[in-house]
Amino acid sequence: MQLEKMITEGSNTASAEIDRVSTLEMCRIINDEDKTVPLAVDRVLPDIAAAIDVIHAQVSGGGRLIYLGAGTSGRLGILDASECPPTYGVKPGLVVGLIAGGEYAIQHAVEGAEDSREGGVNDLKNINLTAQDVVVGIAASGRTPYVIAGLEYARQLGCRTVGISCNPGSAVSTTAEFAITPIVGAEVVTGSSRMKAGTAQKLVLNMLSTGLMIKSGKVFGNLMVDVVATNEKLHVRQVNIVKNATGCNAEQAEAALIACERNCKTAIVMVLKNLDAAEAKKRLDQHGGFIRQVLDKE
């Protein structure tokens, strides 16, 4: 696909004179364009749901979720991956973000990194990619060699693969087994795909990881019941989670959390089933960590 023919490289008539308007009007133009992004994502919800189901199946079988991208796309993958351990209590290696150019590229532009096919393959080899893993290639343009080569290598190994881009029929979309292609149109600043395309990618990644965690029993109702209390805010959140899930008061919630070494799931089952910590943990283990199954099947 030629660069000049890509939707993400097109000229947006709504912002053609944005350099001549007031600051407030600049903001209105940008915001009006941003409003179209959720609608673009809405149109690909079936594709996102299919990807979530595949990711969950692979992770349930011992695989990992691997994000692979360059520039903004790579940074968004790293952002999503880094939030999973504290939010859902998963091991840091379960969701992995890889960026062309390595860690230095998180804060700096690395010349030519996205054009390195070898880089995409080597980064996956360096994390010992296996057929159980799912590789999600992220590239707004859909033409990034680093991502395309990584997806090709992953498929050769037998991995399930997902391609996220904002140009229909792109190489990323056709290389991956599953394509997620929210068409957000031309950017306010021509070619600046960190804007609408980046926002669309963030929304999609939110759904992929959140959907995985919900299906893995990490959410009860809408509560993040595997949250790790790494700071005072999250300590208080744990108490509120147990309160909201059980109807107990703050003192009872804190007592239950202390008794089970601050595991929200165990504390919730303790309160709702009137069990001690050991028995509550045992029942959770018997039901794969799903609070709902403990409550519904016993």
UniProtKB/Swiss-Prot annotation:
The active site is at 83 (proton donor), 114. Disulfide bonds: none annotated. Pfam families: GKRP_SIS_N. The keyword Flavoprotein does not apply. It is an enzyme of class 4 (lyase). GO terms for biological process: 1,6-anhydro-N-acetyl-beta-muramic acid catabolic process; amino sugar catabolic process; N-acetylmuramic acid catabolic process; peptidoglycan turnover. InterPro entries: Etherase_MurQ, Glucokinase_regulatory_CS, MURQ/GCKR, SIS_dom, SIS_dom_sf. Keywords: Carbohydrate metabolism, Lyase. Pathway: Amino-sugar metabolism; 1,6-anhydro-N-acetylmuramate degradation; Amino-sugar metabolism; N-acetylmuramate degradation; Cell wall biogenesis; peptidoglycan recycling. Residues 55-218 form the SIS domain. Induction: Induced by MurNAc 6-phosphate that releases the repressor MurR from the DNA. Repressed by MurR in the absence of MurNAc 6-phosphate. It comes from the Bacteria. A lyase-type mechanism (elimination/hydration) is suggested for the cleavage of the lactyl ether bond of MurNAc 6-phosphate, with the formation of an alpha,beta-unsaturated aldehyde intermediate with (E)-stereochemistry, followed by the syn addition of water to give product. Specifically catalyzes the cleavage of the D-lactyl ether substituent of MurNAc 6-phosphate, producing GlcNAc 6-phosphate and D-lactate. Together with AnmK, is also required for the utilization of anhydro-N-acetylmuramic acid (anhMurNAc) either imported from the medium or derived from its own cell wall murein, and thus plays a role in cell wall recycling. Homodimer. This is N-acetylmuramic acid 6-phosphate etherase. The lineage of its organism: Bacteria, Pseudomonadati, Pseudomonadota, Gammaproteobacteria, Enterobacterales.
